[in-house]
């Protein structure tokens, strides 16, 4: 049994450690500030991953929630809740699960629609949680970066990777792939670095 949100806690703790090591941020002198950063609750269930260099400077600023932040926060919470509770859960219970539980009872077209339905379910579930987290953070006076950018509009796998779970893909790129050497040492090393990055990223995601 693992605590809820342990993967995002791990990502954020590593982000702080690496950013300090790279001298991109100064070490925190307050244990309370560090505890606040790693335990800030809106995103701990399903993201987005919040980097130390993006969040910690906000701790040091006076708390302020503008009318625009409040309105956008409420909108994102309602939109995220609609995605999760209405679209994702409805598709899952009334369509996807029925087909996946007994695929032989349905035609090929219906099974194909089940796959498309599952893709929509996963997107609405995950992005719904992210939208709610971003909205709650805004109501508390903090800004999170966009985590999903219409990924199913992508024209290629590369573009999809840049649009889906942006905080995770950029974290893996900046803290793993580039640290391993990226594409600077020939094709073999590039492909090896990609494989290692995807493997370790998958392991870290599994502990969520």
Residue ranges and their predicted role:
Residues 1-208:
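Membrane-embedded transmembrane alpha-helical bundles that form the catalytic cores
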């Amino acid at each position: 049994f693992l605590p809820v949100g342990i993967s995002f806690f791990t990502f954020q703790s590593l982000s702080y450690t690496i950013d300090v090591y790279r001298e991109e941020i100064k070490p925190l002198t307050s244990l309370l500030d560090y505890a606040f950063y790693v335990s800030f609750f809106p995103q701990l269930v399903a993201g987005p991953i919040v980097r130390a260099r993006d969040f910690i400077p906000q701790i040091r600023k006076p708390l302020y929630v503008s009318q625009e932040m409040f309105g956008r926060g409420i909108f994102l919470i309602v939109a995220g809740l609609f995605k999760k509770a209405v679209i994702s859960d409805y598709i899952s219970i009334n369509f996807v699960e029925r087909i996946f539980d007994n695929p032989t009872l349905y035609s090929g077209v219906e099974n194909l629609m089940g796959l498309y339905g599952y893709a929509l379910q996963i997107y609405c579930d995950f992005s719904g949680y992210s939208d709610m987290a971003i909205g709650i953070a805004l109501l508390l006076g903090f800004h999170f970066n966009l985590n999903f950018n219409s990924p199913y509009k992508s024209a290629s796998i590369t573009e999809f990777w840049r649009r889906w779970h942006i905080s995770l893909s950029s974290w893996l790129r900046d803290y793993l792939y580039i640290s391993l050497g990226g594409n600077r040492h020939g094709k073999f090393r590039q492909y090896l670095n990609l494989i290692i990055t995807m493997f370790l990223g998958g392991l870290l995601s599994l502990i969520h």
